[in-house]
């Protein structure tokens, strides 16, 4: 799968109409609520426009107040009551609309979060290796929040403003075509201003969203690596780097806010000028009976027209900010899922596993893994493995040693197909691993990593993560194999003790013991122990070793370790250097060769 660079999605919104339409399509999940909301908008707009129209007959009544005072008084009362009723209807429909849109946005946000999380889950490991956790989390936080604000308020207010604007134009045409012609000319000026401010807003808000993600990513990285920062006393340098990106974010936010704050005053001043021009032209052009009512009514609509145009402009600014977040969310959703063209599946019958071939034939899973002339690189033209060949017979323990970057962990990444090779082949019981479905392949592999990740939940739940259908007794037996039962039993609630924040309430060695128990309960025929005992003391390592010996019985095992004691009893030890196997053999054979492995043993050089 090609490298995924999310930076290309941090540009300005390229097609806001398409993004908005795609977002609007999510209203299909709440059609009834949307229908009720649209009816509420129509009722609200009709009430506000009707209330403005009442100014015309009220003005005419004031002009004719000298004749038939009783009749005029009765009309006053009826108009005032009607006006009060319209204002009440406006308030009620506005409240109802807000409630309906809150429910709609909650439903749509649930759907968006589900789709976003599902897309993330279907991405390959390469995707997470190449993108910072903080930057990815910003999609779930700032971008989701911006989109939620768009759905709750921006779209609603924009719909109200546009509907009200159209209704206002209709009433203005009905009152005076000549005055409306003046408004068309003045409106063209407003449209020009709106287009200019909208274009600026798109750039500033996209930049703000991009820098927000950068700050989140940097903070997450520094908080996670705080121990290393303090060990090397780089607090000052970290703070200086943070100040740089934080200053950029502050500058972008200030620019975006400045643009927004300028729009309102500019349009308000324009509306005052247009109001005065319309009033002056109306006095000169309108004559005859009822002219005063027409002018007052028209001016009321001019005010409404100007307000709606101003609101639309401001709402477009908010819309652009929200659309920048929505576009980033959709960019993630549009990423292709991890490719898997495998057709060979894994079948289990008790403790026995078999591969089911496409033709229906069964191949017993024995744990025979072979690499043949494998080449691989994470980045083009920078090879990590070169013409690598090795094999692990069923039940053998294969150990990898070598300096950092030699390719040890890469080999295990290729076995479980976190990455795919560029040339050569990897076979599993004679089957090319690319023919095996990835989930079935990984189900046949148990892994224990040095950087153990534990989920929020009880100790029992974390062990059961290795095989969700495992019983409590099976989890306890696995913990005993990993020599974790003793310390777990002495926790405050034993196996029901809740672990927080990646197992922060356990020591590093205890976390690794839980991870080994998780691998034990999985019953995987092949085990990958990536520096599995490098984070525990010698005594604990010895106890784990005893448990692992029982765990590894009858299984094919790949081991990467810091310490020579971890690999002494391996059937074969592979010494890697710059992506090549430079020595291979068991512990005794390699010592007799007096090569790199011999130097590691006698000079006590670290293996990794």
For the regions a language model picked out, list residue spans one by one.
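Hydrophobic alpha-helical transmembrane segments of ABC transporter permease domains
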Residues: 93, 97, 105, 141-186, ...
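An intracellular "coupling" helix at the cytosolic face of ABC transporter transmembrane type-1 domains
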Residues: 29, 125-126, 144-151, 155, ...
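Membrane-integrated ABC transporters
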Residues: 1-48, 63-80, 97-101, 105, ...
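Juxtamembrane helix-loop junctions of ABC transporter transmembrane domains
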Residues: 9-12, 16, 39, 47-63, ...
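Helix-loop-helix
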Residues: 64-69, 85, 171-185, 255-328, ...
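Transmembrane helices of ABC transporter permease
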Residues: 29-43, 86, 153-207, 277-292, ...
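ABC-type nucleotide-binding domain
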Residues: 350-608
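Conserved catalytic Walker-motif region of ABC-type ATPase nucleotide-binding domains
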Residues: 120, 242, 329, 371-373
């Amino acid at each position: 799968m090609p490298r995924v660079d999310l930076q290309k999605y941090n540009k300005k919104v390229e097609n806001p109409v398409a993004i908005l339409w795609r977002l609007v399509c999510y209203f299909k999940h709440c059609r009834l609520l949307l229908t009720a909301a649209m009816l509420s908008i129509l009722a609200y707009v009709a009430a506000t426009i009707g209330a403005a129209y009442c100014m015309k007959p009220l003005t005419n009544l004031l002009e004719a107040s000298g004749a038939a005072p009783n009749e005029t008084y009765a009309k006053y009362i009826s108009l005032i009551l009607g006006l009060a009723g319209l204002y009440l209807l406006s308030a009620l429909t506005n409240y109802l609309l807000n409630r309906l849109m809150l429910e709609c946005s909650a439903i749509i946000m649930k759907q968006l979060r589900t789709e976003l999380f599902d897309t993330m889950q279907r991405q390959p490991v390469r995707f997470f290796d190449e993108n910072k956790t903080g930057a990815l989390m910003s999609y779930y936080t700032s971008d989701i929040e911006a989109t939620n604000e768009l759905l709750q308020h921006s779209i609603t207010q924009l719909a109200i403003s546009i509907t009200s604007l159209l209704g206002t134009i209709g009433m203005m045409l009905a009152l005076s075509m000549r005055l409306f012609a003046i408004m068309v000319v003045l409106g063209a000026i407003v449209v020009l201003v709106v287009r200019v401010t909208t274009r600026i807003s798109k750039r500033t808000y996209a930049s703000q969203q991009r820098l927000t993600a950068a700050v989140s990513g940097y903070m997450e990285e520094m908080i996670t690596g705080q121990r290393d920062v303090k060990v090397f006393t780089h607090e000052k340098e970290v703070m200086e780097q943070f100040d740089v990106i934080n200053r950029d974010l502050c500058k972008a936010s200030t620019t975006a806010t400045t643009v927004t704050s300028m729009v309102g005053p500019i349009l308000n001043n324009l509306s005052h000028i247009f109001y005065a021009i319309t009033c002056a032209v109306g006095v000169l052009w309108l004559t005859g009976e009822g002219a005063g009512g027409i002018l007052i009514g028209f001016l009321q609509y001019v005010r409404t027209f100007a307000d709606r145009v101003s609101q639309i402009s401001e709402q477009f600014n908010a819309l652009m900010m929200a659309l920048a977040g929505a576009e980033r969310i959709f960019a993630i959703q549009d990423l292709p899922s991890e490719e898997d063209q495998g057709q060979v599946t894994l079948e289990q019958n008790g403790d026995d596993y078999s591969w089911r071939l496409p033709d229906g034939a069964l191949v017993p899973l024995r744990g025979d893994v072979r690499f043949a002339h494998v080449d691989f690189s994470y980045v083009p033209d920078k090879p990590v493995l070169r013409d690598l060949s090795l094999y692990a017979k069923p039940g053998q323990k294969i150990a990898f040693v070598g300096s950092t970057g030699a390719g040890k962990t890469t080999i295990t990444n290729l076995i479980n197909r976190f990455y795919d090779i560029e040339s050569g082949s990897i076979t599993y019981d004679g089957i090319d691993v690319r023919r095996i479905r990835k989930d079935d392949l990984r189900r046949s592999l148990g892994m224990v990593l040095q950087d153990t990740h534990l989920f929020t939940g009880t100790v029992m739940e974390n062990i059961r993560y290795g095989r969700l259908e495992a019983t409590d007794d099976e989890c306890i037996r696995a913990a005993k194999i990993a020599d974790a039962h003793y310390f777990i039993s002495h926790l405050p609630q034993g196996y029901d003790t809740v672990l927080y924040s990646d197992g922060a309430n356990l020591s590093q060695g205890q976390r690794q013991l839980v991870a080994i128990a998780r691998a034990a309960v999985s019953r995987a025929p092949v085990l990958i122990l990536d520096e599995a005992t490098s984070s525990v003391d010698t005594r604990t390592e010895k106890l784990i070793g005893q448990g692992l010996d029982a765990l590894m019985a009858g299984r094919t095992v790949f081991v990467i370790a810091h310490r020579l004691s971890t690999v002494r009893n391996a059937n074969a030890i592979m010494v890697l250097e710059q992506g090549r196997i430079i020595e291979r053999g068991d512990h005794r054979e390699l010592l007799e060769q007096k090569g790199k492995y011999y130097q590691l043993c006698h000079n006590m050089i670290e293996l990794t």
